[in-house]
């Protein structure tokens, strides 16, 4: 009888693991979905549709909160729209996720230089 208990426990564990694996999307699927949102955001930003781009990049970081490039793009869009506090936070999150990413670091340093120098710049709601 003692051999039945461990087998049933193992079976329950396997069933639980399989259920979780099929219930949630894989990391690769999430990253691909986030990349699609980022690409769409880039496309609409190039056409001047910054609010739509922000929506897409916000979706990207909801889908994959570890996607530093999406935070960088989001920061640029917030900056463009005058949402400077949000831009700063997005740049900082991008740097937290990718501290060695020179593009993110360069964008953030330029953002700080411009906004710290023009401290009188008003933020849009």
Task: Pin down the residues of each PLM region.
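Conserved structural position within tetratricopeptide repeats
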Residues: 59-62, 95-96
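Register position in tetratricopeptide repeats
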Residues: 46-47, 80, 110-117
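Helix-start (N-cap) detector for alpha-helical repeat units in TPR-like alpha-solenoids
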Residues: 34-35, 68-69, 102-103
């Amino acid at each position: 009888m003692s051999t039945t208990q461990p087998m049933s426990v193992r079976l329950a564990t396997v069933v639980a693991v399989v259920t979780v694996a099929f219930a949630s999307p894989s990391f690769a699927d999430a990253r691909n979905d986030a990349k699609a949102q980022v690409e769409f955001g880039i496309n609409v930003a190039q056409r001047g549709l910054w609010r739509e781009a922000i929506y897409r990049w916000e979706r990207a970081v909801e889908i994959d909160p570890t996607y530093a490039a999406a935070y960088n793009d989001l920061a640029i869009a917030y900056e463009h729209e005058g949402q400077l506090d949000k831009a700063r936070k997005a740049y900082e999150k991008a740097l937290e996720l990718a501290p060695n990413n020179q593009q993110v670091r360069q964008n953030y340093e330029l953002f700080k230089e411009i906004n710290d120098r023009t401290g009188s710049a008003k933020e849009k709601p």
